[in-house]
């Protein structure tokens, strides 16, 4: 993991705190799971499901969706990166065992309203805040400025000095 995998002891402490305070605790799987991290994720997911079940597991791609279905019976939430953009996608996600989906952030209110009215499952929306443009193994900004190796990223892109420009040099 780019930011380091959560240890089972840390997850258990969070789970205990959530139970004591009546707060929901969802388990958010990584968007990208490298081949050499598959076993770690499987072991952690299995242990959490057995001993410290979260309220739900958030999945970001069809591979992790299949993994959660195979290893657990936990409720599954589809993250926005699964591109829930229309009724067919929402129905497919429901048929795959998803119990809640986050709509694609590209949708506007006019597009969201009919989906919300006719959705086969509960929906969530991202309404503000920074949104990643892509998920990549390597960060362009970080690779030039450093701090993008294994471990915590220095996130130079969030310091307000960098922006994407189109071919006309406009933001």
Model-identified regions with their sequence ranges:
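Active-site pocket-lining/capping segments in soluble small-molecule metabolic enzymes
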Residues: 1-92, 96-171
